[in-house]
Amino acid sequence: MKQRLIQYFTQNRERIAADIVRLMSAFVAERTINVISERLADYPFLKCRGEEYRVAELVKQEFRRFGIRFTEYARRPERPNVVGTVGRDEAGTRLLLAAHMDIVPAGDGWTTDPYHVTIRDGIAYGRGVLDNKGPLAAIIVAGGILTELFGDRPMAGQLLIAALADEEVTDPDGIDYGIEYLLTERLIRPSHAIIPDIGGDMRQIDVAEKGQAVIRITAQGRQAHGSTPEQGINAIYRMASLVRELERLVLDYTPHAVLGIPTLNLGEIHGGAAPNIVPGECTIHLDIRTVPGLTRQSLEHQLQKCLVQVDGSFRMETISWSEPHQLDPDNEVVRAIQNNSLNLLGFRPEPFGMGGGTFAKTLNLAGIAAVGWGPGSENAFHVTDEWMEIRQLVDFALLICLISWDLLT
């Protein structure tokens, strides 16, 4: 049966590539931009964050075309998740393939229209072709081919093909519309998962991810007229002193064998209303990636010690927190990926740990054996002229079919 799949892809490769590109292009044309609520006004065409329903409608249309059963789950109508199912679900093994429908803003400097897929020399350019609309198109087409060739008959297990909402940012309101919503409400119950959202050109398998803390620190001063700065307290100057302390901060931690060391990035700073006003507040946001052993309590304590080194008044809040995780790389999902990749492409993807966060972490922390693995370059995420090799998307679709066959029949 696996040989039949390989033969089918060999004979129909151009048509399969065209199918993936057609679907990916339709997804990319929908500007499903996800930003935190306070930035929503920068995107007047959005009525809410994400608006993943725009892509979800296309996903449902495609599932109907392929004859794939599906269910829509939505905490909010504009932000749905669509889960298609293939297989009889009699074996207790459920493999989740999950890709997200939301994207980050395009930003500036593109040489192509970011919301229109441009193809040059076998490479597709556009916002989302890698993260994550290209892989989403590939897993849908893979599910369609399995259904076309075999129906549900040979697969005693079940393949879940999920188009998910709300991956790119965590809003300060703490409400999740994607994978955490589905797991908390027990709407899906996979035993294993593959998340195609790490890059690595299919040569790496993400089995460990750092934790993430997003910290907001506000320096409090006293507003005054710009011509009499001595009557105020300049919150930006106060924050500048703290930034120097943060640059010198050495976190107390134990290096991890796979994940290495924690990192701290000062990613945002906001302060002041006008040049002729002494600013009364200045705020920064820190992104800290943690390793096992560095607890939330310990991190917050170390940052508080840093604050007291600076003369002034500060307010610190932990906006979001997620734990690190590590999955034993000796498991059947990793073996299925490695064996099929070696047989088809001639290389054996290797397990590794990463600092970025994917749905794999959320799933693993919920007790589901999930790995990150997929097509595309890790250097193409969130960049100008985001790109994806079409060849990789087709190879990935075939590998998904072969891996699903190994795990579910």
Label each PLM-derived region with a short phrase.
Residues 2-124, 148-155:
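Acidic/His- and Gly-rich active-site-bordering loop/insert found
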Residues 123-137, 225:
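Glycine/serine-rich anion-binding loops at beta->alpha junctions
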Residues 98-99, 162-164, 193-197, 218-220, ...:
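Short beta-strand segments
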Residues 132-208, 408-409:
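Acidic/histidine-rich catalytic neighborhood of metal-dependent amide-processing enzymes
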Residues 71, 96, 160-162, 315:
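A structural signal for isolated positions on well-ordered beta-strands in alpha/beta enzyme cores
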Residues 1-15, 54, 71-76, 105, ...:
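Metal-dependent amide/peptide-bond hydrolase catalytic core
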Residues 93-95, 123, 160, 191-193, ...:
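Structural motif
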